[in-house]
Each structure stands twice: as C-alpha cells, then as structure tokens.
Amino acid sequence: AGAFPQNANEAVIVVGKNNEISDLTLAQLGLLDEKKFVQLFRNGENGGIDPDGELPPESVVGFSQILSQKYTLFYNDVVYSRDTANYPLDDPKLSLTGKYPFVYSGGQREKGDLTAKDGEGINIKVTGILRLKDELTYGCLTSGLNLTEATINEYIQGNMKSQIVQWMKDSAKSSIDLGDLKDMDPTFADYEGVRLFFPAAANLTEKGFTQRTFGQNTVYVAISPEEAIRALGGDDTVNSVHIYAKDFDSKEALLNYLDDWNAWCTSGSGSYNGIAL
C-alpha cells in the first residue's frame, strides 16, 4: 500500500506475511493507544483471539491510518540543554551529587508541537507499507518503521556536532580518575588509574550506563563511553553488515571464507582492527 520512499524524509512500515505487526511496535509508533493496548493484554489473559473468528476492533489498524502517520527526529541540541545553573563548572565530580551538565527536555513539548523547524531535526512521513513475500523468510528490512539511509546519515551528522556529544568526547569533562576521589572515600585509592565516565544527562543512565557503589558513594559508570556516544547518535561508525548470498553455492563459499577469516584471527595472526566476523 502507498508508495516506496522517493525522498530522504520518507519512511515505510514493514509488516508480516499476514499484515501482522506486534502490539508493542504499534504502541511505540503511536498507532495503539493505552486503552486498546490494555484490552489486547486482557484478550490474551482470556484465551487469546480466535484465529477463525472476527478480529476485535482493538487489534486492527487501517492502512489509511498508518499512511497518515508523521514522526519527528529532533537533534540533540533541541532536546538537551546545558544546565549552567546546577552544573556551572565542567567538573565530573558534580555528577556524584546527582547533578548533570545537560537537562533532557524532549518530553516537555506540547503534544501538538512536534514538527521540527529548520535546523531542529527531520520531519518524517510514512509513504508506504511493505509486506514480506510468501516465499521469503528474511529480508534486509525489519518489522516496524524503516527509514532511508539518507535520513539516518543526516540525523547522525546533525548530532555529531551537538553540544552534548562534544562534551562526552572531552574526557577531561566527562570522566575522572577514580584515584582523585580518595579524599571523599579512601577506598577509591585502590582504583588509581581507572577512569570513571559520567552520563551527560539523567535520562542517559538508562542508555549504556550501570549503577555502581564505591564505599558510601553511588555513581553511574558507563559500560563504555563509545556506547554512550552512539546512544546520542554521535558516531557514524558502521554498526553491522548484512551479507546476502545470491544462491546456495555462493552461501557456502561465503561461510567458508568467513570461517577461514575467524580461524586466522583466533590464531593470533591478525584481524581487521581487531574485528572477527
């Protein structure tokens, strides 16, 4: 239904062979309100939906409703603002007191004011609905909302130069040697030379950060600063590569090549930037 994207700011919704899509995905895309979502949950508790019967209205979303959907990708500088009042200095120790250099305000926009103005982000329109062919069991597009490569690249480029990403990339501002905290707690002396990376905003504690306790102090430790920056769209490094063979012979040749590559890497002979496939 609809049309395949012709412009960078257009997107498609991918559904299953029977036009199905998960209720969670529908809710995340704003196509299923709370009342209908709860009713679907109750239907499941009561034995589910009769596959031979008529579908209940809460489980059906019309194509016309999907094709009228619009979404907005706001740049970091629109949803993250520098908190100079509570975090006047670029001192990572302030994060130990529950303060952060940036405040997330993305959820504070009025419901009807979700259109990005020039330079604020990318406005996206759903133009088509794609369905997997019966003879296919996989494809390059995943179920749900799929953006064009041009949209993703534009969004990443816009966020790479944002204030919060630049702050995260400056290790002098976003991290501290744990040994420097020994005046606060003597146990930190045992972590001399270990750098502690702090999240730039409170909501980022859920994006690549875990909570740790050192002595009497509870701090947020990043799994890795690289992952935190990626969560902010501040890294254009390729995340994954999908290879599709044209036939079974090519598939076997490809798998043999990858096995040889991994064996070569495992033997210690080398790798491509430390990457095994």
Model regions and ranges:
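Basic-flanked hydrophobic alpha-helices used for secretion and membrane insertion
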Residues: A1-G274
